[in-house]
Every structure is written in structure tokens, then in C-alpha cells.
């Protein structure tokens, strides 16, 4: 309950918007595509969610990062375009960590091309994450990452 959610590459916002009635609060949705961002804005408005509960940040979160809304992120959804280098994804996590924007018990849901499995495993290990769960759906992999204890 009360988990702070970051939904990077959010279009159409379904994951984070569905997390809100399940106890998440707030959700930050990031989307670089203008048309997709407009769909997210319409979805937020249709659900009558105020900016205190769901906020759209247009632009490329992988390039610029995102500031946590007063509390660190507990849950991050990452579903970037499959051509995205996994190093960019782990770079975002590193920048968020350096900004103290990640909860100690953070969970990351990372969907990526299955051909990147080895790179993701290596980057997770060297970045302080473990793959707690991995599922394959055709050419797609869904990893649930957890932070390793650093103390």
C-alpha cells in the first residue's frame, strides 16, 4: 500500500493506472512519444485522477531521468522499445539510485527482447540487482528485478 510507482515508456498507462486502485500512490508516467502521451493524459482524465495521484512526464526518461515525488520509488515498470540498449535502462536505475530515488525494497518489472537476456543478467549482477523471476513469451522476456542488500 502506498507504493510510489514510476512507469517509464508508459503508453497507454495501463500498468501504473491499474496499480493505483490496488494501493499504489502516486504514479509517475513517462512517455517520449507525443501521441502516446496524449492518450495517457486522456486516460488519467477519464479516471478523474488528480496530479497528486497520477502525473505524466513527457520526454525520454531513459535520457533525463525522473525525480521521485517526495518519496523513493518502490515499483518501476520498464517497457522501453525493444531496440533500447539494456545499458540505458541500468543507467537510469543508477542515476535514480545516486539521487536517493529508489526504495531499499524496490521491485523493477523489465520487459525486453529475449536476445538481450545475457546482457541483462550481466548488467543486473554488476549493478546490484538480482533477477527474482524471469518469464519468456515468444521473443519477449519479462524480468522482475530486486535490489541486493548493500549493507
Model-inferred region functions:
Residues 1-151:
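Class I S-adenosyl-L-methionine-dependent methyltransferase catalytic core
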Amino acid at each position: 500500500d502506498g507504493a510510489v510507482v514510476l512507469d517509464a515508456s508508459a503508453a497507454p498507462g495501463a500498468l501504473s493506472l491499474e496499480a493505483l486502485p490496488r494501493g499504489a500512490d502516486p504514479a509517475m508516467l513517462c512517455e517520449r512519444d507525443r501521441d502516446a502521451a496524449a492518450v495517457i493524459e486522456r486516460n488519467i482524465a477519464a479516471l478523474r485522477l488528480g496530479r497528486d495521484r497520477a502525473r505524466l512526464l513527457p520526454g525520454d526518461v531513459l535520457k533525463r531521468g525522473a525525480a521521485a515525488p517526495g518519496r523513493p520509488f518502490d515499483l518501476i515498470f520498464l517497457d522501453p522499445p525493444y531496440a533500447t540498449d539494456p545499458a540505458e535502462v541500468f543507467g537510469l536505475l543508477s542515476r535514480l539510485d545516486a539521487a536517493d530515488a529508489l526504495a531499499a525494497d524496490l521491485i523493477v518489472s523489465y520487459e525486453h527482447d529475449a536476445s538481450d537476456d545475457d546482457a541483462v543478467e550481466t548488467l543486473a549482477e554488476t549493478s546490484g540487482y538480482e533477477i527474482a523471476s524471469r518469464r519468456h513469451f515468444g521473443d519477449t522476456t519479462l524480468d522482475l528485478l530486486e535490489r541486493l542488500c548493500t549493507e
